[in-house]
């Protein structure tokens, strides 16, 4: 871990050991029992795995000082999006699919049958 101090490395190793311990404390469910019992055990196991994953993200987020997930990109509403493919999209061969362009105007094909009154 180049560029880090020894204390920082030790803290990171402690965090990783803690996360490893959390995952090891939740072994996969046993395959015995009725179908319903197995299903319930798997459901509870998945819920615990989800909780462990969230705790691990919080531990690493606290250690790293930033969230694990990037900030989501703000997009316009889906009703206003459509694909507008130019001529180079229809080329065949090994050139790929081209570069589709995203238009933000509402197409007339997707509009509802009712007309809006002004």
Swiss-Prot record:
Motif range (Nuclear export signal and binding to XPO1): 73-84
Recorded GO MF terms: DNA-binding transcription factor activity; RNA binding
Record keywords, A-Z: AIDS, Host cytoplasm, Host nucleus, Host-virus interaction, Methylation, mRNA transport, Phosphoprotein, RNA-binding, Transport
Motif (Nuclear localization signal and RNA-binding (RRE)): 34-50
Comment on protein domains: The RNA-binding motif binds to the RRE, a 240 bp stem-and-loop structure present in incompletely spliced viral pre-mRNAs. This region also contains the NLS which mediates nuclear localization via KPNB1 binding and, when the N-terminal sequence is present, nucleolar targeting. These overlapping functions prevent Rev bound to RRE from undesirable return to the nucleus. When Rev binds the RRE, the NLS becomes masked while the NES remains accessible. The leucine-rich NES mediates binding to human XPO1.
Family: Belongs to the HIV-1 REV protein family.
Stated name of the protein: Protein Rev
Organism: Human immunodeficiency virus type 1 group M subtype D (isolate ELI)
Gene this protein is translated from: rev
């Amino acid at each position: 871990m180049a560029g880090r101090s020894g204390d920082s490395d030790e803290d990171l190793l402690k965090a990783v050991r803690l996360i490893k311990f959390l995952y090891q404390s939740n072994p996969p469910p046993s395959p015995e029992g009725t179908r319903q019992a197995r299903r319930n055990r798997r459901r509870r196991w998945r819920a615990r795995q989800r909780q462990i994953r969230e705790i691990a993200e919080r531990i690493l987020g606290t250690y790293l000082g930033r969230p694990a997930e990037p900030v989501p990109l703000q997009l316009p509403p889906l009703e206003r999006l459509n694909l507008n493919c130019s001529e180079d999209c229809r080329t065949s061969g090994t050139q790929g699919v081209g570069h589709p362009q995203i238009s933000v105007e509402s197409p007339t094909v997707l509009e509802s049958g009712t007309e809006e009154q002004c």
